[in-house]
Each structure stands twice: as C-alpha cells, then as structure tokens.
Regions:
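Short, structured active-site-proximal loop/turn typified by the sulfatase FGly-forming signature C/S-X-P-X-R
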Residues: 7-47, 51-54, 95-99
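Non-catalytic, well-ordered alpha-helical segments in soluble enzyme domains
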Residues: 22-23, 85-92, 260, 271, ...
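His/Asp/Glu-rich, glycine-adjacent segments
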Residues: 52-239
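Histidine-centered active-site microenvironments of extracellular/periplasmic hydrolases
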Residues: 276-314, 364-365
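Residue-level recognition of tetratricopeptide repeat
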Residues: 419, 454, 488-489, 523, ...
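TPR alpha-solenoid repeat register
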Residues: 422, 457, 491-492, 526, ...
Length: 603
C-alpha cells in the first residue's frame, strides 16, 4: 500500500476509524520500514519486488524510451534488469499471483496469474489494455471489472466530500482531469475497488502460494487532499478544508474495510498477511505548501523515508514492540516465508524479528534461471503516452520539462533506454543513499546530455558543488536551474543564502543574492532576501535600498513588515507606523505585527 505512514495510521487506529488496522497492530508484528532516496514509487516498489538496489534493477523513472521509436512511454517491466520474487517463486514450483505492481507491463508468464499495472484506472484509464494479463484469457474479465468498479456514482462521492451534489455532477461533466479534486477522488476510488476486486476474485479462484497486490490510492489521496486535511496549512483555504478535510479519514476507513477482508482470507487459509509501504508521508505540520504544478515535480516533497511494515497471521510474532526493517528486507523475507533462499543481488535480510519461526536462508546462486517471458503488448501511441504524462504531471510526479514525449534518438538494442529523469534519479540515489558524489555527478551530466534545459540535474549539481565547498560553481548551477524552471526563485535563493550565512559564509550568501537580484530585477522575493541579508549583517540602509522600490506597488505583508523593520533600525517611527498599518490592512491576522504597531504608536 503506497505511502502508508505510522503517524496517520496510529491516529486513525486510536480514534476508531481503522479497527482492523488496530487489530493488525495488536495481534501482529510491526516495524518502521526504512526507505531510501529518491522517494519515487516505481524505483522503490521494484526494489521491494526484487530486493535489488536501483542501479541493479534499473527501473528508475515513471517513463522509459521506446527502443524502436525513441518516444517516451510509461515505465514497463522491460526496463527491469533482474528477476522479481514472483519469478523466483514460480521457478521453484510455487503458484503465484501478481496484481497491479508498479512497472510490470506487459504481464509476465508465471506459474499462476499476472495482472500488470496497466489495469489501474488512475493512470492508465483509456490506454491500451492489451498485454495486461496472463493468461491472456483474463483480459476481458479485467475490462469488465474495471468498468463496473470504476463507475463511481455521484452519491458515492458525496460520502467522502462535503460538497453540494450539483457541484459534484458539474465537476465530473466538464471533462476535467486529475487536477480536479472530485475527478481525482473518483479515479482513486475506482482504482482501489477495481484492484481489490480483481485480486480477491483471482485469489479465491486460484489460491496461490504467493499473492502480491499493489494499492496506489493510499498515496494518491494524500497528494490530492493532504493539504486540505487538519491541521490546516497556511497555504490551504478554509473553504478547501471545509469541503475536503475529511476525505483522507473516510478513504482510509474504506481501506480498513478491504484489509479486514484480507484478514478473513488469511485466517481461513492459515496464510501470512504482509502489508508494507514504499515510503512514509507527511501528515503533520511538516507538510509542504508546494502543490503539483507544471514547473516543479512536487510529489516527492510529501514523502518521508520511514514507511510501514506489518506481518499478521499464525506465523507472525504477536504484540512485539515496533521494530526496524529496510525496504531491502521485503523480498528476502517473502522468499524465506516460502522456504526459498534469497538471491545474491539482495543486500537485505529476512525480518526474523517479525515471525515466530522464520529463519534466514543462505544466499543462493541462480546462474541458469529461465528468462522472464512476457505476453505480447498492444503498442501505445504518442498521444496516449502524452496523456499518461499529463496525469503524472497533475499529481506532481513529473515536471512540464519531463513530459516531452520524445528523446533525441531511439535506444540501441531491444531494451528501453533511460530518460533524463531516470539518470537524474540515479544521480540522487548515488549522492544521497550511496554517498558516491563522482557517480552522482556522472549521472546528472548524462541527464543534461539528453535534456540540456532540464532544471533538476542542474539543481542537483549545485547541491554537489555546495557540498564540495565550491560556492562559485554552486551559485552557477543554482542560477542556471532557476532560469530553466522559469518561476520566482526567491524562496530557493533565500534558503540557500540563509544556509550560507548560518555556516559563516556571508560572502557566498551576498554573491548569490546580488547575482540573483541582477538576474531577476522584478522579483520582489529575491529583493526581500537580499535586504534581509543586509539587515542581518547590520547594514540597515543597504537593506532599505535593496527593497524600497517595491513599496509603492507591493501587496505582500512580508515586504511591508521587512521595510518597517529597517525603518525601526533607522529610528523612523512615522514610517514604521505607516508600513505596519498598511500591512495589517492587507492581512489583519498578524497578531505579532499588531503588537509591534501598538508599541510604536505608544512611544
């Protein structure tokens, strides 16, 4: 279940929203699941399924380059360079079932059944379904289930949102995409219910030894509605909180009902139920105010490294304290439960603490394993690939620069080539997880070789240069990345300059701010950051000079408050009063500013 986080689950279990989850915690074994950077779902779920690091399994982005046309298409199992647990279990004679796992299209031929991620109505609705199932005879049934479960009535949506029925109907009739909360909720519910129905029906029919099911909505509901969920964020309107503030708890109550059904199946069959996420999610005051946009790929800003791991059933160790596990431990744990040795590509170990009778098996060499065979997939047109990319952008998974649907040239050979996003993600993995700046730099440069105007590797090269102490190069790459993204650089420039100041490098901070002010003369935010730097350095007149040109036209209380601060420093009481009165006229909800104004008036 994507994006599960203990903070939210503990709260919903305690308040009675998720009684089945509370039972899981009480009767099973739980752990914090350590993930790794970058916190991007296709990468992490492929590590969970293979036990291999990203630079080994090679699923590194939401997209790949078609080896025949050079077009960007949705990431597929063709990018995966190693076998998954279902291949290993199938080859060992176990019956397996897979439903909806990230990057698994076309469906793989296994000893059992296989439904690829293209059966999900969230990202793949309206795209070719051919090749989504093994045996292929399952495909007509998949289409029927998706159509039936995907038909979410307006009255059903009304159970989740506090929106008048007429507005729900109007939102759905406009043809809006996932950027519309009502439409997004309908697709999240459709995907959740279709995935669950397909998995449950096939499990009941086939009773495999291993069933691997991926639920996407537990993450998507956060990306769409977490900003409207209490406690209220400064960037969230009260109207949105009133309309959508209960969506998350109501959706997780639905998830709890589905979990209860799997618990009953596990009890009936004496099976072990494992539930894990790929990463956690920010649900408290640490939630970012950045929303999905065409400039920033913001989805990963909401993720945090600590996810969720739960085991439940006869073999689970009951009521043990919450432990610690790694995402790399998932695959060897599952293989050990099936009495199959882990593979040498797996750096993790079986989570023995979570089970009463589990023992880690010796690593196996599998040199002559049969290759993965996949069914024939229906080709995807450039238009269809573009629609997929637009959905990813609406959810904050891709920036606008990454939605271009063609690469400079077709890939060599039969395997898909890596996109600029894949190289950038690999660089982040090398820099932040492996701690190998040389390989990280090489990956970022490969990303720029494909897309010279791609802002993210520029920014990441700036981070590398800053870590190396090369402030001039850090400034160069940072300003290049800000120019490429074509948005107000003030918040980022300010954060970097304050960090330079905090580390005692005021010269680097001033250089960055002055160059930024020249590059962005119309940016009030940059001017405000430069003025605050001058103020911190004790030069109130330079601070005033850097920002005063924006005073006549500004509608930003922060600018007026900063100017009042400088005027206070210069003992210009009348100016202070005028500026603070104007600031409070724009935003009366500033109690500290109101107190400052009162003190100035009473002197």
């Amino acid at each position: 279940m994507d994006g599960l986080d203990w903070d939210l689950l503990d709260r919903l279990a305690a308040d009675g929203t998720m009684p089945n989850w509370k039972r899981l915690e009480t009767e099973g074994a739980t752990a914090r699941l350590r993930s790794f950077a970058p916190l991007i779902s296709p990468i992490l779920w492929t590590t969970a399924a293979t036990g291999a690091p990203p630079d080994v399994h090679r699923v590194l982005d939401f997209q790949e380059v078609d080896p025949k046309t050079g077009a960007k298409v949705p990431i597929s199992g063709l990018s995966r360079a190693v076998q998954a647990i279902w291949n290993t279990a199938s080859a060992a004679g176990r019956k397996v079932g897979v439903v909806g796992w990230w990057a698994t299209h076309p469906a793989e031929e296994v000893n059992g059944f296989f439904v690829s991620d293209h059966a999900s109505p969230i990202l793949f609705e309206g795209l070719p379904l051919g090749g989504a199932a093994y045996p292929p005879a399952l495909e007509p049934g998949l289409a029927q289930v998706s159509a039936r479960e995907g038909a979410i009535p307006d009255a059903e949506l009304a159970r989740f949102v506090d929106v008048p029925p007429g507005e729900i109907a109007a939102a759905r009739s406009t043809g809006a995409g996932l950027e519309n909360p009502i439409v997004a909720l309908s697709r999240i519910l459709a995907s959740t219910r279709a995935t669950h129905r397909i998995a449950r029906d096939l499990y009941d029919r086939e009773r495999p030894n291993l069933l691997a099911v991926y639920y996407e909505g537990t993450d998507e509901v956060g990306h769409v509605f977490a900003s409207s969920t209490p406690p209220r964020l400064a960037c969230a309107s009260q109207a949105d909180v009133d309309r959508y503030g209960k969506v998350v708890s109501r959706y997780y109550a639905e998830i709890d009902r589905l979990i209860g059904q799997w618990m009953r199946r596990a009890e009936e069959d004496g099976a072990t139920l494992l539930i894990h996420s790929d990463h956690g999610f920010k649900w408290g005051a640490d939630r970012p105010c950045a929303l999905a946009s065409g400039n920033w790929a913001t989805a990963a800003f909401w993720h945090r490294p600590d996810g969720v791991f739960v085991s439940w059933g006869k073999r689970a160790r009951r009521g043990s304290p919450r432990g610690d596990a790694s995402l790399f431990d998932v695959a060897p744990t599952i293989l050990s439960l099936l009495d199959i040795p882990p593979d040498r590509v797996m750096p993790g170990t079986a989570a023995e603490f979570a089970f009463a009778d589990l023992r880690a098996l010796p690593v196996a060499e599998r040199a002559n394993r049969p290759p993965v065979t996949r069914v024939q997939a229906e080709p995807m047109s450039t238009k269809e690939a573009s629609e997929y990319a637009k959905k990813l952008m609406a959810l904050g998974y891709l920036s606008r620069s990454e939605t271009r649907t063609s690469a400079p040239a077709p890939a060599a050979g039969d395997r898909p080539a890596m996109t600029e996003g894949a190289w950038n993600n690999l660089g982040v993995y090398y820099r932040d997880t492996v701690k190998d700046p040389a390989r990280a730099r090489d990956a970022f440069e490969k990303a720029l070789a494909i897309a010279p105007d791609y802002y993210s590797p520029m920014f990441n090269l700036a981070v590398l240069a800053r870590a190396d102490g090369d402030m001039k190069m850090a400034e160069l790459w940072l300003l290049r990345s800000m120019a490429a993204i074509r948005t107000d650089p003030g918040p980022v420039i300010g954060a970097w300059s304050r960090e330079f100041d905090a580390k005692g490098n005021a010269g680097a901070a001033l250089s960055l701010l002055e160059h930024s002010a020249r590059a962005y003369p119309d940016s009030e935010a940059v001017a405000r950051e430069l003025s605050m730097h001058h103020y911190r350095m004790g030069d109130c007149r330079a601070a005033l000079a850097a920002l005063s040109r924006f005073e006549p036209t500004t509608k930003e209380p922060r600018t007026l408050n900063a100017l009042a601060l400088f005027a206070t420093c210069l003992r210009e009481r009348t100016t202070v009063i005028r500026l603070l009165e104007r600031s409070l006229t724009i935003n009366p909800n500033q109690p500290e500013i109101a107190r400052t104004l009162a003190r100035a008036q009473n002197r």
